[in-house]
C-alpha cells in the first residue's frame, strides 16, 4: 500500500504546478502575438471566412452552466481558414456559443496538435452565485498540432474573488449544479476515437450552451446528439448510476446486452433482494464506456460531489496534459458525531479547508481514516468559518443532535457518560428501594433525570420490571397508571405491583381480561396490546403515566397495536418503555419508540431514514430497511432517550440464578376444562373417601392442570421468541404439553429439539450438541423426569418450567442443565403458574420442602427469597384441605414413584384402572397417550432422597 503524501510533498507539487502554468501562459502569449496578423486578416474579410469550405469551428464545452470550468476540444485535420458561421451571429453571441471571427484563432500549420482544447470560466458549482469576471480574465487554452494557441483577447489571470458569500442550495436534492440541466456526460476517449474515425473533411464539433443540448456538426450541418458517443434510439432503455457507500448501483430494467457487460466486470455483485447490480468504483469508467457503445441503453452517470457527472478518473483521462485548477474544485461533506465529546468532518480533500482545520484548537487527525475531528464546543465556530470558503460545503450536525448535546456544545465534557443526579426516593415504598441493585438504582436516577420519559433497554434478566415500578411510584401523585404488556404476563405484573408496593391495596389494581372490561376502573390498569386496540373509545381520558412492556411490539407503525398506543403515549407526561432487544441493526424499527419518548426528535421519518436507515430510492419508492451511522445513532439514544446495560456489564451484581414466577392468564382456560378442574377439586374434598380414592382424584387434578395450561404456555413461549430470546429450555411432564409445544414450534418454523423418555442415549447426546452449537433461534423441549440430569445446555441462560413437579430436587436438577461449568451469565428461571389449578398447591408445597431442607443444612437454595412474586395462596378452608392432601400424599417414603406410576398409567377414558369410576364421572375424553409422558425406568428416581447431590458443587 502506498504511503500518503506529507504536507511538504503536497506543497512542493502545488508549487511545481503553478510554475508550469505560468510558463505555459507566457508561451501562449508569445505565440498569440505571432498569430495576430493572420487573425486580423480573417476578421477583415468576413465574406471569405464565411465561404471557407474546410474551416473547422471551435468546439464549445458540454458543461451546462456558463460560469463553469469548460474544456473545449477540436480535431484539426488541416490549417485552413475559419469555418462558416450563421447569418444571425448576434443571437449566437448572446448565448455564448459563437465567437466573433476576430476572436477565433487561426490554426498554425506545423504546430497544431491533434486535439485543440480551451479552458474557460470558473468552477461549475460557482454557477449558483457567480461573481462578475471580465471576459479578459477567462483562461483559455487551444492546442494545435505542435504548440498551444490563444486568442488575442485572452490573458492568463488567476481567479480572484475578494468577497465570498455562502453558496446557494441547489434547486433539487436529486441533482447537483453540474448536471441540473439534464446533460449527459462526455467521454474524452470516445470523442477522440469518433473524431479519428470520421472521414477526411468531416470533423465533428460540439456546440453547447447553458440552455441547449450538445449537438454534433458534420459538413456545416447541426444535428442533435444524445448523451453517448453512439446514436441512441428513441426507444432506448433509460437507467442511472447511484452511489452506494464505496460502490455504485445501476438502476435499470432488464437488458440482455447490459447484463452481459455486467458479467465481464471483476467487481460485479448482484443483490437478489433489490434485483440490482453493484460494482466497485474502479469499474465505473469501464462500465460507462461499454454502456455508451450500446444503442439500446441510455445510462445516466453518477452525480459527483465535484459538480460533474463524470468520475474524476474518466474526466482526467481526456484532460491529460491540461493544467488543473485545484483552487476552483468543489468539495462537499458533512459532520458526524463520533463520541460524546468529538465530531468528525467527513469531506474530501481541499487545501483551503485543511488550512482552516489547522486553525482549530481541538483538532485531531486520524491517520487510518484520514479524517479530522474536533471538540463539540468548536462545532459552531468551524461551520461559520467553512461558510466563508466558496468552494466548500460542510453540512453541520442535525438539529436533533444539537438539541440532545446542547450542554456539550456549550462546554464539552470528556466524560463517557452524562452526569446523573441522585433521585430522592423517600416517598417510594422502602421495601422496593432497598431491593434495588446498584445498577437498577442508577437506572431509576437516569429515568427521573429525563423527566420520566425513557427507553429502558437493559438486557433480559436485569430487572426492568422492578425499575419501571419504582419509576412509576416516584410519580404516584400523577396516577392513574396504565401498563400495556403482552397478554401472557398481565397477571405477573399484578403480582409484581403487590409484592414491591405493599402500601398498595389489591383493589387498586385492574387487570383488563376482556374487551368488555373498563380500562380506567383502577389506580393501576393493566391491559394487553391486543385489547388496547379494542378499547380505543375508552382512551379518551388521558393517562399521565404509561408503562409499555416489550415496547418493540410497536416497531411497525401500521399495526393496530401501534396505532392504538401512539396517541396514548403522545399525550402522556411520563412514558416508560421497556425492551430487552432494541433493534439497533434495523433503525427503522426503533423510530416509533424514539418519537414515543421524544416526539420532537425527527418529526419526519424521511429525515431519520436518510441519515440512519441508509435510505435508497428504488423504482417502487424509498427503501429504509438498511442501516447507516449506527455509532452516531447509539450516542444520540444513550444521551437523550435510551439506557441499556448488558449482563456482562453488571454480572458481579447478579446472583447465579434468578427465579421468577410467571402467573399466566386463567382466562385462557376454556369452560369445559374449568368445569373439569372444579370437579376434580371437589372430588378431593369429598368426605367418606379412602386415601387411595383421594390420591386418584389428586392425580386427575394434576392431569387436568396440564391440559388447562397449554394455551397460556404456548403464548408465553411465542412472546419470548418475539422478544428476541434466541435460546432457552422448556421443561414439562405431560406428553400432551410436550406435543402441543413442539407442534406450535414446527408450525412457526422455529428450530428446536425434543428429549423425552423415548429418546435413546446416543440420540440425546447428538441433540444436545446440535442445540449447543446452533447460532440461530433454538428451543429445547425437555421432559422433567427424562432430561433433568446428565445433559449440558450451557449455551442457553433461560429455563422455562411449563409445569411444576412435586419434588423440588427434580426441579433443581433441571435448572442445573443450564447452570453448569461453562456458563458465563446469570441464569433466569421462569416458573409458569396458573391460578385455580394444581399449581396453587404444588408451589407452596415446593417452597415448604426447600425451606425444611435448608434449615437442616441439606440445601443452599431458598425459593422464597430468590423468587419474585411468591406470595399467593388461597386462604379458605377448602383450599387449605387440598393443600394438606398434597402435602400428605407426597411426604411418605416411596410416594414419588407410586404417584408417578399412577399418573402415567391413568386412563380417564376407561371405567377400570387406578382411578376407578371417578374418571367416568368426570366425563374426560383424553386418552392416556396425550396425558402422560413415556414410562420411565425406576432408576431415574433413585436420587430423589439424596439431597446432598442437589447442593454439592458443580
From Swiss-Prot:
Changing residue 705 to I: In SIOD; increased ATPase activity; aggregates in the nucleus; decreased chromatin binding. GO terms for biological process: DNA damage response; DNA repair; double-strand break repair via nonhomologous end joining; regulation of transcription by RNA polymerase II; replication fork processing; t-circle formation. Residues 7-20 have a biased composition (Basic and acidic residues). InterPro entries: HARP_dom, Helicase_ATP-bd, Helicase_C-like, P-loop_NTPase, SNF2-like_sf, SNF2/RAD54-like_C, SNF2_N. Its EC number is 3.6.4.-. ATP binds at residues 458-465. It comes from Homo sapiens. It is an enzyme of class 3 (hydrolase). One of its GO terms (cellular component) is nucleus. The modification Phosphoserine is found at residues 112, 123, 129, 151, 198. Changing residue 579 to L: In SIOD; increased ATPase activity; aggregates in the nucleus; decreased chromatin binding. Residues 1-20, 27-238, 904-934 are annotated as: Disordered. Changing residue 548 to N: In SIOD; increased ATPase activity; aggregates in the nucleus. Belongs to the SNF2/RAD54 helicase family. SMARCAL1 subfamily. Interacts with RPA2; the interaction is direct and mediates the recruitment by the RPA complex of SMARCAL1 to sites of DNA damage. It comes from the Eukaryota. Signal peptide: none annotated. Pfam families: HARP, Helicase_C, SNF2-rel_dom. DNA damage-regulated phosphorylation by kinases that may include ATM, ATR and PRKDC. GO terms for molecular function: ATP binding; ATP-dependent DNA/DNA annealing activity; helicase activity; hydrolase activity. This is SWI/SNF-related matrix-associated actin-dependent regulator of chromatin subfamily A-like protein 1. It catalyses: ATP + H2O = ADP + phosphate + H(+). Residues 445-600 form the Helicase ATP-binding domain. Residues 909-919 have a biased composition (Low complexity).
Amino acid at each position: 500500500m502506498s504511503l500518503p503524501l506529507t504536507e511538504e510533498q503536497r506543497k512542493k507539487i502545488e508549487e511545481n504546478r503553478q510554475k508550469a502554468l505560468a510558463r505555459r501562459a507566457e508561451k501562449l502569449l508569445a505565440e498569440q502575438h505571432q498569430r495576430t496578423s493572420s487573425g486580423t486578416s480573417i476578421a477583415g474579410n468576413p465574406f471569405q471566412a464565411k465561404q471557407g469550405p474546410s474551416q473547422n469551428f471551435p468546439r464549445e464545452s458540454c458543461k451546462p452552466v456558463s460560469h463553469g470550468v469548460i474544456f473545449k476540444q477540436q480535431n484539426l485535420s488541416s490549417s485552413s481558414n475559419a469555418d462558416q458561421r450563421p447569418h444571425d451571429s448576434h443571437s449566437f453571441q448572446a448565448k455564448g456559443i459563437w465567437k466573433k471571427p476576430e476572436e477565433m484563432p487561426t490554426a498554425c500549420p506545423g504546430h497544431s496538435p491533434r486535439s485543440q482544447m480551451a479552458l474557460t470560466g470558473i468552477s461549475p458549482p460557482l454557477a449558483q452565485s457567480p461573481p462578475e469576471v471580465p471576459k479578459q480574465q477567462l483562461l483559455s487554452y487551444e492546442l494545435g498540432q505542435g504548440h498551444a494557441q490563444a486568442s488575442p483577447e485572452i490573458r492568463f489571470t488567476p481567479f480572484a474573488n475578494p468577497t465570498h458569500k455562502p453558496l446557494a442550495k441547489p434547486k433539487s436534492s436529486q441533482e447537483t449544479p453540474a448536471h441540473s440541466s439534464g446533460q449527459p456526460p462526455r467521454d474524452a476517449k470516445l470523442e477522440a476515437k469518433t473524431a479519428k474515425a470520421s472521414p477526411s473533411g468531416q470533423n465533428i464539433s460540439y456546440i453547447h450552451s447553458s440552455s441547449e443540448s450538445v449537438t454534433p456538426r458534420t459538413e456545416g450541418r447541426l444535428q442533435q446528439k444524445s448523451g453517448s458517443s453512439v446514436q441512441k434510439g428513441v426507444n432506448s432503455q433509460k437507467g442511472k448510476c447511484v452511489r452506494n457507500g464505496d460502490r455504485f448501483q445501476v438502476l435499470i430494467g432488464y437488458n440482455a446486452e447490459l447484463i452481459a457487460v455486467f458479467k465481464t466486470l471483476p467487481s460485479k455483485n448482484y443483490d437478489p433482494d433489490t434485483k440490482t447490480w453493484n460494482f466497485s468504483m474502479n469499474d465505473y469508467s469501464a462500465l460507462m464506456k461499454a454502456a455508451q457503445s450500446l444503442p439500446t441503453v441510455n445510462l445516466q452517470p453518477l452525480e459527483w460531489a465535484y459538480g460533474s457527472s463524470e468520475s474524476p478518473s474518466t474526466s482526467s483521462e481526456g484532460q491529460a496534459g491540461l493544467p488543473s485548477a485545484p483552487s476552483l474544485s468543489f468539495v462537499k461533506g458533512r459532520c458526524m458525531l463520533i463520541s460524546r465529546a468529538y465530531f468528525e468532518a467527513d469531506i474530501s480533500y481541499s487545501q483551503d479547508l485543511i488550512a482552516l482545520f489547522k486553525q482549530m484548537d481541538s483538532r485531531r487527525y486520524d491517520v487510518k481514516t484520514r479524517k479530522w475531528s474536533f471538540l463539540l464546543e468548536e462545532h459552531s465556530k468551524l461551520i461559520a468559518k467553512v461558510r466563508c470558503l466558496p468552494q466548500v460545503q460542510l453540512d453541520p450536525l442535525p438539529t436533533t443532535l444539537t438539541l440532545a448535546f446542547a450542554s456539550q456544545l456549550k462546554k464539552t465534557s470528556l466524560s463517557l457518560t452524562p452526569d446523573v443526579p441522585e433521585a430522592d426516593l423517600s416517598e417510594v415504598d422502602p421495601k422496593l428501594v432497598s431491593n434495588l441493585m446498584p445498577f437498577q438504582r442508577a437506572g431509576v436516577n437516569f429515568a427521573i433525570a429525563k423527566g420520566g420519559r425513557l427507553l429502558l433497554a437493559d438486557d433480559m434478566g436485569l430487572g426492568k420490571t422492578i425499575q419501571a415500578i419504582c419509576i412509576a411510584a416516584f410519580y404516584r401523585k400523577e396516577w392513574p397508571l396504565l401498563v400495556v404488556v403482552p397478554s401472557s404476563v398481565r397477571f405477573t405484573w399484578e403480582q409484581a405491583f403487590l409484592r414491591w408496593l405493599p402500601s398498595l391495596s389489591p383493589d387498586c389494581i385492574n387487570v383488563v381480561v376482556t374487551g368488555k372490561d373498563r380500562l380506567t376502573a383502577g389506580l393501576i390498569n393493566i391491559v394487553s396490546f391486543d385489547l388496547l386496540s379494542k378499547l380505543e373509545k375508552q382512551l379518551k381520558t388521558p393517562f399521565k403515566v404509561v408503562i409499555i412492556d416489550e415496547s418493540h411490539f410497536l416497531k411497525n407503525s401500521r399495526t393496530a397495536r401501534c396505532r392504538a398506543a401512539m396517541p396514548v403515549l403522545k399525550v402522556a407526561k411520563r412514558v416508560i418503555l421497556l425492551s430487552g432487544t432494541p433493534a439497533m441493526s434495523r433503525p427503522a424499527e426503533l423510530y416509533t419508540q424514539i418519537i414515543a419518548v421524544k416526539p420532537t426528535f425527527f418529526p419526519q421519518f424521511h429525515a431519520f431514514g436518510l441519515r440512519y436507515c441508509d435510505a435508497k430510492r428504488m423504482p417502487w419508492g424509498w427503501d429504509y430497511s438498511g442501516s447507516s451511522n449506527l455509532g452516531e445513532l447509539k450516542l444520540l439514544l444513550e444521551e437523550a432517550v435510551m439506557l441499556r446495560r448488558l449482563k456482562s456489564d453488571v454480572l458481579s451484581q447478579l446472583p447465579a440464578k434468578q427465579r421468577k414466577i410467571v402467573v399466566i392468564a386463567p382466562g385462557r382456560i376454556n369452560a369445559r376444562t374449568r368445569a373439569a378442574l372444579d370437579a376434580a377439586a371437589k372430588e378431593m374434598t369429598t368426605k367418606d373417601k379412602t386415601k387411595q380414592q383421594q390420591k386418584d382424584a389428586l392425580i386427575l387434578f394434576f392431569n387436568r392442570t396440564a391440559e388447562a395450561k397449554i394455551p397460556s404456555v404456548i403464548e408465553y413461549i411465542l412472546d419470548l421468541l418475539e422478544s428476541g430470546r434466541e435460546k432457552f429450555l422448556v421443561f414439562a411432564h405431560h406428553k400432551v404439553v410436550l406435543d402441543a409445544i413442539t407442534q406450535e414450534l414446527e408450525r412457526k418454523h422455529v428450530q428446536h429439539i425434543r428429549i423425552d423418555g423415548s429418546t435413546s442415549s446416543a440420540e440425546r447426546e447428538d441433540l444436545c450438541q446440535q442445540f449447543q452449537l446452533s447460532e440461530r433461534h433454538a428451543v429445547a423441549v425437555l421432559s422433567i423426569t427424562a432430561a433433568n440430569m446428565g445433559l449440558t445446555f450451557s449455551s442457553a441462560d433461560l429455563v422455562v418450567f411449563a409445569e411444576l413437579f412435586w419434588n423440588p430436587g427434580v426441579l433443581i436438577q433441571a435448572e442445573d442443565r443450564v447452570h453448569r461449568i461453562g456458563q458465563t451469565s446469570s441464569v433466569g428461571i421462569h416458573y409458569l403458574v396458573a391460578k385455580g389449578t394444581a399449581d396453587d398447591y404444588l408451589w407452596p408445597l415446593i417452597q415448604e420442602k426447600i425451606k425444611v431442607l435448608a434449615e437442616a443444612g441439606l440445601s443452599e437454595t431458598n425459593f422464597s427469597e430468590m423468587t419474585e412474586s411468591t406470595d399467593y395462596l388461597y386462604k379458605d378452608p377448602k383450599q387449605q384441605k387440598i393443600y394438606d392432601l398434597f402435602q400428605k400424599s407426597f411426604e411418605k417414603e416411596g410416594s414419588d414413584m407410586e404417584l408417578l406410576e399412577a399418573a402415567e398409567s391413568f386412563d380417564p377414558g376407561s371405567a377400570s384402572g387406578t382411578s376407578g369410576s371417578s374418571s367416568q364421572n368426570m366425563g374426560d375424553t383424553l386418552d392416556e397417550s396425550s396425558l402422560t409422558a413415556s414410562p420411565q425406568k425406576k432408576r431415574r428416581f433413585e436420587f430423589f432422597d439424596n439431597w446432598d447431590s442437589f447442593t454439592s458443587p458443580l
